[in-house]
């Protein structure tokens, strides 16, 4: 079985802080030779529903996902097809994810300025399934290094993801996963730790350019 390339944390125009079209995201994913993607929009599955429709019978597998705002920070409901309420406690959010058949993955765990859950909460109090140890949206990399250290110490499965809010950043960080190209196999492989985090940080110059252009466009 060959390793598959996956970007598990991408935002689309259904997130309030992104204007990326699903078609542009898919085009970029193909340019980056990505096999598996997940649109993980803030508190809505509208984007993930669209990408699943558009990738049926194609070369890309779309995993349903959502980034949920708990009271203490963000949590990915990876594999969740339905909305999960925001502003629940972290463990209540995780319980809802598990009840939906998904995995609870902590994005940018220690990034305090981006609602990193483990900046506010001890992971030992939570039934998490995996954490991001390579999130492409960083400035100096300290938060990623801290997450990687925790993953190794506590044997928590580690993922890489672009957290792209602009389609050109898709694939900057990614995972290589030892799985068949179907949703159930991917979820099981993550739980078993058959996944590796890879990639680089999104260029801060390009990120600043995107934020400037986005701010201008939103005022038009």
Regions from the language model: what does each represent?
Residues 38-41, 105-106, 132:
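Conserved beta-strand positions in the central sheet of alpha/beta enzyme cores
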Residues 3, 97-105:
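Short beta-strand/loop segments at the ligand-binding rim of alpha/beta enzyme cores
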Residues 105-113:
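Aromatic-lined carbohydrate-recognition surfaces of secreted/lumenal glycan-active proteins
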Residues 1-27, 32-34, 45-52, 57-64, ...:
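Charged catalytic cores and adjacent phosphate/nucleic-acid-binding surfaces used
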